Amino acid sequence: SSPVRKVCRGLIEDGLSTILVTRDIVTRIQAQMLGVPAEDFAADQVPSGAGHYTGRADVYVPDALLSLFKREGISAESLYTVDREGRQQPASLTENQFAILRSDREEKRTLLGRFRGGRVYPLCHNGCRPFGVRPRSLGQQFMQEALLLSAEEAPLVILMGPAGTAKTFYSLAAGLEQVMEPESRAYRKILVCRPNAQFDQDIGFLPGSEQEKISPLLRPIVDNLEILLDLEHKKERSGEEELRSRINYLFDTGILTAEAMNFMRGRSITDTWLIIDEAQNLTPRQVKGIVTRVGRGTKVILLGDPAQIDHPLLDERSNGRSYARERMRG
């Protein structure tokens, strides 16, 4: 990249308007130190901060309409938001966006719903307990709803949040519920992929089979499985050996499988619960490659924390998970 910076500097000295466009953050900093304007690819950038899509909205509704909510939902025309100056604005909702409905008389009186077809309807899976797990926060209630919707209704779910918000834990719980339970079975298996910054580049240099190569990356998945299986058998005091045996059973029977990201290309994945953990370390191109591999009856769950990006060429606005969030809204 040094010759590139020198060329840019030479063009500037010749009086030509020059901007260096690169994804490499270090190169941009070095260029600016030399007096060369540098920026990232604008086309791949998504809004940051308050401008990005969160998947939920806080809206107000006339108190008299709340009694009709469970029976027929509430029209979006009756909803409004309040700006910082206290002025009312018509609510602008996106299809499938979750809504927190607040009474205009008593703000603490709230109801939860999902916007579809011009109206906000109650959540369908509010009372469910996938694999015995109960939502403990507002975000987890919305998470549960999105995960338990059918693949036809919600083929792609994007979960974002800091560490400790149960993204991986809840995704596994909902997946196991819909793969292992006969009454609610909707998928053949769970497929887990978990990239990291160097995963696609250096997996071939690790010894062993594909499973042995990716096993270090799946330790967080196994940690969550241990908690879930312990919850399922909470009346029994499971020893370490028995717990390990149950986890091995899931892998040995094909209920749960794990694959490397660079082996996804060219596949058509059907009737599968597909979890992509740490998706903030994927590029937009990689996310597009995953989504286009999905066949009939498959549900894709992208998980990620935008504050924990390890890829040297990605940031909060250019990573694949953020890109998918903005492009696939609705």
PLM region spans:
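Conserved helicase motor core of SF1/SF2 NTP-dependent helicases
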Residues: D14, I25-G35, E39-R71, C124-L148, ...
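Interdomain "pre-motor" coupling segment immediately N-terminal to P-loop NTPase/helicase cores
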Residues: D40, Q45-N126
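Walker B catalytic carboxylates
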Residues: D277
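Acidic, metal-associated active-site segment
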Residues: S1-S17
